[in-house]
């Protein structure tokens, strides 16, 4: 018993000594985590070089765009063919994908050989052979009469210019077909099919095996955004942000990058890591100086590395008693499969002996232990190097997404990964050690790259179908020049109807006289109070106008909230609240009890009977205070002031915000004769000739007309321009059938239009993978400020996703692009409609004055105009386009409509004083 224990101990010690001896000898092949992180850092730099326009030509790691812009989302369906060519055999596959709530893939495939003489013959022979095999396969399945889409996996270095156009850079893996390098392989295969003439197919996509692997796994796991192959060769691909890919135009979305990482180190960046054995392998290879990283890690070279180490150690008399056999000296005799077999056993001694004896050697126990250890070191180094480069890719994706922790899946294929007993486990452990901030899942691709090519094709078909469906919906919101001219024409007709005594009562565009007959002339002076009520907040202002235009205007103001219960209570409660706030403001300014002239900006539809008498026609913007509609708001305000008995005010003028805006800008620019607001609501005013204002007596001079253009279309005159989404938003609003034009252009409604379109797209499976979240069903979540943020040019899709996440909408990159597109279309239409209305106004002023050309300024205010990144520009372009005889300038009103009310009061006081004199 003791003897056997001693013997076991002796062998263990012997084994241990032998292992240590090999470890020392191969010290440079054993890489620490520190070294691996350094390699990872270098690889990151190489990736950036490959992506940059200026550095790409000289970069070793080519980072080739694949034009694959999306991974599967599980809704793909249809029948597809795939060709998988990447070695001496190639496969033809028929893939049927069904999506009836259960993702299901059916496959038929057949393997065809490529004879050596065809591999080395002409390109025509090669592609004719492929077409023949394809015909044979389609015959068997009896599908020759169908024109099916085909995906082509072509695993050779290519320069891809489109999804279905790929130029072979150079043959590898023993292929030498003449006349193919530098040519588009898709065109060559199409020609071969045409030469036969007995079937037709639609070649949609050409991809390499790495991309195929990512797509195959992406169908089962939607987090899969990296593809890895470690087999005869090695390569990886991953989804990169378009904004970083300089070789392809466009910044939106993502694209899969075929890294061609086998060439890492070809520029010398791994020279300190490569050993004498790596150099020897390279010198004896078919492509010296090329694919140096691949030669350190892939199955084609691993066995050869072990053989070279065994030879050198034998020559130095460290193994086999210094004896060599002819077989051991023969290149390629030690195969990668042998490494897997030897490492597959616990101690590997029996298998090592078998392999070494096959090579004509007579190994001792120590020789077998050493061989086992050499295999371990070579395969572990391979897994570690793979892990280092993968860590760089994961780190990059994590930074691209700006996530604290990245959840990502890597789709993997290749004989080394699948067949080596420990490679996968070592790779996983090392990756997780090197990037602790990532939760990485490795998913084996079971059906290889052929199914992946079919998936790329299926995704391309899905994207094209979905794109067509979305465009069909969105085209109703995209207005042509002629359509916009028609909107302008109709607006002019409605303006006429509102101004005319006969038609005014039934006209939706009310064209209300404001009794403001002059703009500032610069001689106004004095202290004025202004009230500005037009939304859930209102302002009280003290405006000090110094004599002369350059004396300027000094302003003090305070903002007060109007609680919802007051908005929806009685009129007395609302006006008592307003007076309470005025009292607070006067006290705050140290002016308690002072009597001042007051201008009141009241931004609701009113019928004005004089400058200081204005009858509220109807509440808008969510107000519902009872007992106000049909009443004079100045009287309601005065009554509330008397109820308080604390101060008295001289209410000189009541105006709406649009007029206030025109007056504010008129103080700066004498050409300003139009006011426009595009914010929560929308409206416009302008200086009309008195002779046309039939509701007011007098023919001389001009008067500002408050158009109340939000109601344009309430008589059905815009019905052919309204979409189902406009109708839905209108029906669910507080005032169905009213303010239809406003509901197509103003900030209060654009987000709702977008939300309704997104719901429609989701129901039809064109967005958010067809899943409608409860959040998306919630009215009002899509605030217009989000539209402004989403469309901001400096915002990457990443931030768009963050906004959508904040709204509780889990979105992919593709979803973010679609949401952004919808926002763009809706906001653009709003700006164009607004521009068409404005063109009608300025053209009317020009025609009123009988001018060939008019120079006019529009004073503008409102959050949509000011904050949306493109609204103003699109609107300006539209006005220029539709009213070419008018030179229109736009002046932003900086101090809002409150200052305008004070200026109107100042002008009125000036005119009143002049009259008294």
UniProtKB/Swiss-Prot annotation:
<dbReference type="GO" id="GO:0006002">
    <property type="term" value="P:fructose 6-phosphate metabolic process"/>
</dbReference>
<feature type="binding site">
    <location>
        <begin position="84"/>
        <end position="89"/>
    </location>
    <ligand>
        <name>ATP 1</name>
    </ligand>
</feature>
<dbReference type="GO" id="GO:0072655">
    <property type="term" value="P:establishment of protein localization to mitochondrion"/>
</dbReference>
<dbReference type="GO" id="GO:0001678">
    <property type="term" value="P:intracellular glucose homeostasis"/>
</dbReference>
<dbReference type="Pfam" id="PF00349">
    <property type="entry name" value="Hexokinase_1"/>
</dbReference>
<feature type="domain" description="Hexokinase 1">
    <location>
        <begin position="16"/>
        <end position="458"/>
    </location>
</feature>
<dbReference type="GO" id="GO:0005813">
    <property type="term" value="C:centrosome"/>
</dbReference>
<dbReference type="GO" id="GO:0004340">
    <property type="term" value="F:glucokinase activity"/>
</dbReference>
<dbReference type="GO" id="GO:0008865">
    <property type="term" value="F:fructokinase activity"/>
</dbReference>
<keyword id="KW-0963">Cytoplasm</keyword>
<dbReference type="InterPro" id="IPR043129">
    <property type="entry name" value="ATPase_NBD"/>
</dbReference>
<comment type="subunit">
    <text>Monomer. Interacts with TIGAR; the interaction increases hexokinase activity in a hypoxia- and HIF1A-dependent manner.</text>
</comment>
<keyword id="KW-0007">Acetylation</keyword>
<dbReference type="GO" id="GO:0001666">
    <property type="term" value="P:response to hypoxia"/>
</dbReference>
<feature type="modified residue" description="N-acetylmethionine">
    <location>
        <position position="1"/>
    </location>
</feature>
<keyword id="KW-0496">Mitochondrion</keyword>
<protein>
    <recommendedName>
        <fullName>Hexokinase-2</fullName>
        <ecNumber>2.7.1.1</ecNumber>
    </recommendedName>
</protein>
<dbReference type="GO" id="GO:0005741">
    <property type="term" value="C:mitochondrial outer membrane"/>
</dbReference>
<feature type="binding site">
    <location>
        <position position="30"/>
    </location>
    <ligand>
        <name>ATP 1</name>
    </ligand>
</feature>
<feature type="binding site">
    <location>
        <position position="235"/>
    </location>
    <ligand>
        <name>D-glucose 1</name>
    </ligand>
</feature>
<keyword id="KW-0808">Transferase</keyword>
<feature type="binding site">
    <location>
        <begin position="784"/>
        <end position="788"/>
    </location>
    <ligand>
        <name>ATP 2</name>
    </ligand>
</feature>
<feature type="binding site">
    <location>
        <position position="897"/>
    </location>
    <ligand>
        <name>D-glucose 6-phosphate 2</name>
    </ligand>
</feature>
<comment type="function">
    <text>Catalyzes the phosphorylation of hexose, such as D-glucose and D-fructose, to hexose 6-phosphate (D-glucose 6-phosphate and D-fructose 6-phosphate, respectively). Mediates the initial step of glycolysis by catalyzing phosphorylation of D-glucose to D-glucose 6-phosphate. Plays a key role in maintaining the integrity of the outer mitochondrial membrane by preventing the release of apoptogenic molecules from the intermembrane space and subsequent apoptosis.</text>
</comment>
<dbReference type="InterPro" id="IPR019807">
    <property type="entry name" value="Hexokinase_BS"/>
</dbReference>
<feature type="domain" description="Hexokinase 2">
    <location>
        <begin position="464"/>
        <end position="906"/>
    </location>
</feature>
<feature type="binding site">
    <location>
        <begin position="208"/>
        <end position="209"/>
    </location>
    <ligand>
        <name>D-glucose 1</name>
    </ligand>
</feature>
<dbReference type="GO" id="GO:0072656">
    <property type="term" value="P:maintenance of protein location in mitochondrion"/>
</dbReference>
<feature type="binding site">
    <location>
        <position position="209"/>
    </location>
    <ligand>
        <name>D-glucose 6-phosphate 1</name>
    </ligand>
</feature>
<feature type="binding site">
    <location>
        <position position="708"/>
    </location>
    <ligand>
        <name>D-glucose 2</name>
    </ligand>
</feature>
<dbReference type="GO" id="GO:0004396">
    <property type="term" value="F:hexokinase activity"/>
</dbReference>
<feature type="binding site">
    <location>
        <begin position="532"/>
        <end position="536"/>
    </location>
    <ligand>
        <name>D-glucose 6-phosphate 2</name>
    </ligand>
</feature>
<feature type="binding site">
    <location>
        <begin position="603"/>
        <end position="604"/>
    </location>
    <ligand>
        <name>D-glucose 2</name>
    </ligand>
</feature>
<feature type="region of interest" description="Hexokinase small subdomain 1">
    <location>
        <begin position="73"/>
        <end position="207"/>
    </location>
</feature>
<comment type="pathway">
    <text>Carbohydrate metabolism; hexose metabolism.</text>
</comment>
<feature type="region of interest" description="Hexokinase large subdomain 1">
    <location>
        <begin position="208"/>
        <end position="447"/>
    </location>
</feature>
<dbReference type="GO" id="GO:1905091">
    <property type="term" value="P:positive regulation of type 2 mitophagy"/>
</dbReference>
<feature type="binding site">
    <location>
        <position position="680"/>
    </location>
    <ligand>
        <name>D-glucose 6-phosphate 2</name>
    </ligand>
</feature>
<feature type="binding site">
    <location>
        <begin position="413"/>
        <end position="415"/>
    </location>
    <ligand>
        <name>D-glucose 6-phosphate 1</name>
    </ligand>
</feature>
<feature type="region of interest" description="Hexokinase small subdomain 2">
    <location>
        <begin position="521"/>
        <end position="655"/>
    </location>
</feature>
<keyword id="KW-0021">Allosteric enzyme</keyword>
<dbReference type="GO" id="GO:0005739">
    <property type="term" value="C:mitochondrion"/>
</dbReference>
